[in-house]
């Protein structure tokens, strides 16, 4: 698939978020640009880290490919060096789908879970993707009442999320990394199929070194734990991308 990158990037983005910009290629496809911006606390903390966009595009592409190889349908089409991805155009469902294998982050702030302890089973959590309301947690009734998804779609989304977890947990385990938790977004294509969309990167996952439990994700930036790009590079290296 040949695309004229420079011409596409001259267009006004369809969407420009905290760390990515999305450009239309045609009626069915978009170009996702992974920028070097890094944020935490819903954008309250912000910096620009050279090389982050490249690493996230590279890692996301690899993980989308792994999902596709294991029967999980995604919006991913192709990686374009250095920081771009071609993807199917989808309508994003405004629900953040979070899967947790180990207690960490907000789960420990909100509930009496012990930080770092393995959960008895993967917990699937839905949050309303809405900055104005602070991305509150959803239950099924609220999601349906708000018209975000049907009950059938929510059941399917949970099924997809658990399959994503199964694939990625195994992949990272083989690379000496613990998949603590992650969030994904789900989009609908023209036919109404549910596809894993957005990105899957150290921006959207918690990853710990299996032996040392060193943090290899955006918590390094959130908590000022050191050089976040160096940690992202470790993830890319373990995945055989560098």
From Swiss-Prot:
UniProt keywords, alphabetically: ATP-binding, Ligase, Nucleotide-binding, Purine biosynthesis
Listed pathway(s): Purine metabolism; IMP biosynthesis via de novo pathway; 5-amino-1-(5-phospho-D-ribosyl)imidazole-4-carboxamide from 5-amino-1-(5-phospho-D-ribosyl)imidazole-4-carboxylate: step 1/2
Xref: InterPro entries: SAICAR_synt/ADE2_N, SAICAR_synt_PurC, SAICAR_synth, SAICAR_synthetase, SAICAR_synthetase_CS
Protein's name according to its UniProt entry: Phosphoribosylaminoimidazole-succinocarboxamide synthase
Domain of life according to the entry: Archaea
Enzyme class: ligase
Family: Belongs to the SAICAR synthetase family.
EC number: 6.3.2.6
Catalytic activity: 5-amino-1-(5-phospho-D-ribosyl)imidazole-4-carboxylate + L-aspartate + ATP = (2S)-2-[5-amino-1-(5-phospho-beta-D-ribosyl)imidazole-4-carboxamido]succinate + ADP + phosphate + 2 H(+)
Organism: Methanocaldococcus jannaschii (strain ATCC 43067 / DSM 2661 / JAL-1 / JCM 10045 / NBRC 100440)
Molecular-function annotations in GO: ATP binding; phosphoribosylaminoimidazolesuccinocarboxamide synthase activity
A Gene Ontology BP annotation from the UniProt entry: cobalamin biosynthetic process
Keyword Coiled coil listed: no
């Amino acid at each position: 698939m040949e695309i004229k990158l420079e011409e596409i990037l001259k267009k006004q983005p369809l969407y420009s978020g905290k760390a990515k910009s999305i450009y239309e290629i045609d009626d069915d496809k978009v170009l996702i640009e992974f920028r070097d911006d890094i944020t935490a606390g819903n954008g309250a903390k912000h910096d620009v880290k050279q090389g982050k966009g490249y690493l996230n595009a590279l890692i996301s592409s690899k993980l989308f490919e792994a999902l596709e190889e294991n029967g999980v349908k995604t919006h991913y089409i192709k990686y374009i060096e250095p920081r771009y991805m071609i993807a199917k155009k989808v309508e994003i469902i405004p629900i953040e789908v979070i899967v947790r294998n180990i207690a960490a982050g907000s789960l420990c702030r909100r509930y009496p879970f012990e930080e770092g302890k393995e959960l008895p089973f993967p917990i699937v959590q839905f949050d309303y993707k809405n900055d104005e309301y602070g991305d509150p947690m959803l239950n099924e009734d609220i999601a349906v009442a708000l018209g975000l998804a049907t009950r059938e779609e929510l059941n399917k989304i949970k099924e997809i999320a658990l399959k994503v977890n199964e694939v990625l947990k195994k992949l990272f385990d083989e690379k000496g990394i613990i998949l603590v938790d992650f969030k994904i977004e789900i989009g609908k294509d023209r036919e109404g199929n549910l596809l894993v969309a957005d990105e899957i990167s150290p921006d959207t996952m918690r990853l710990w070194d299996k032996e040392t439990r060193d943090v290899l994700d955006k918590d390094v930036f959130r908590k000022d734990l050191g050089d976040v790009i160096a940690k992202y590079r470790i993830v890319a290296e373990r995945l055989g991308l560098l």
